[in-house]
Amino acid sequence: MDRLSFLTFIMLILASYRLTHLIVFDKITEFIRKPFMKKKRIVDQNGHVDEKSVPASNFGYMLNCYWCAGVWCAILIGLGYLFLPRIAIPLIFILAIAGAQAILETAVGVGVKLIDVLKSLQTMMNDKKS
């Protein structure tokens, strides 16, 4: 690898982001995380019982930690790009598109919520003036 173009670098970042999110958060990969998690009962001051999933091992912590999994996903994506480009590049391309889409979807969702909040504030201000 002599030079890495800016576009390729951005695609590697987006692919790593999406793979990390897929492993740590997405419902579709819950079956991967589940064997490494255990249920823990938590009782609050009022006596309410809640059940929470916590990592059962160091590997469980890695699968549950965005920062930890992110490092390993970046290593996997980077090594795949360098040593198995015929296999890795199509996967990187797909993951990069999905990663960019996820970021855009989040931005749109935040924007829609912000608009709703601003409309509510405007309505409250108009009601106070009346």
From Swiss-Prot:
**Mutation effect (residue 125 to I):** In strain: ATCC 6633
The gene that this protein is the product of is: yngL
Q: Would you indicate the residue range of the signal peptide?
A: none
Q: Which residues, by range, are in coiled-coil regions?
A: none
Into which family does the record put it? Answer: Belongs to the UPF0713 family.
- Give a yes or no for keyword Membrane in this entry: yes
Q: InterPro entries from the entry?
A: Mycophage_PG1_Gp7
* Parts of the chain that traverse the membrane: 4-25, 62-84, 89-111
Quick one: a GO cellular component term? Answer: plasma membrane
Give UniProt keywords alphabetically: Cell membrane, Membrane, Transmembrane, Transmembrane helix
Top-level division of the source organism's lineage: Bacteria
- Where is it localised? Cell membrane
Official protein name in the record: UPF0713 protein YngL
Q: How does it sit in the membrane?
A: Multi-pass membrane protein
Main localization category: membrane
